[in-house]
Amino acid sequence: MSKDPVPLKAVHHIEFWVGNAKQAAYFYRKAFGFDQVAYSGLETGNRDRASYVLEQGRIRMVFSTPLNSNNGISEHIKAHGDGVKDIAFHVDDAKKCYDACIDRGAKSARKPETLSDENGSVTKASIFTYGETLHSFISYNDYDGPFLPAVSYTHLTLPTIYSV
């Protein structure tokens, strides 16, 4: 029996590109009980998008929205509407998985690179699957942060909203 050339450990996250990430994140928190664990936007120095990272158990979703109309997310949403942009996988070796896919004819979206911050580092690489949808491979080198490094994410503690 041959060895799996792209051994996947788990789904790391699914990223949705949407017109209103704040509203989408609110809906998933209130309707399905997800917790918001990280945020990136103008307040964290990210000038092109706002992203909300939600978690429930081992499920992690990211809702990203453009902060201006001259950006790839804006163009993608205009062409396709809200939807999944990236299904990212947790793997032992992102470069090895990426190389195995490229060797088998996959089209590169993002060559392997190491992302680092004060919480450690990860290696991330991406390939195109069908259309403009991506599969990313993420391997943890020594990372112990809330989501991914070098993205200016900050932990959020959200107040409970009570209705009368």
Predicted features, each with a name:
Residues 155-164:
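Single conserved hydrophobic/aromatic residue that forms the stacking wall/gate
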Residues 123-141, 146:
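C-terminal catalytic ATP-binding subdomain
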Residues 150-153:
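Short, compositionally biased segments
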Residues 2, 8-9, 15-26, 30, ...:
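Vicinal oxygen chelate
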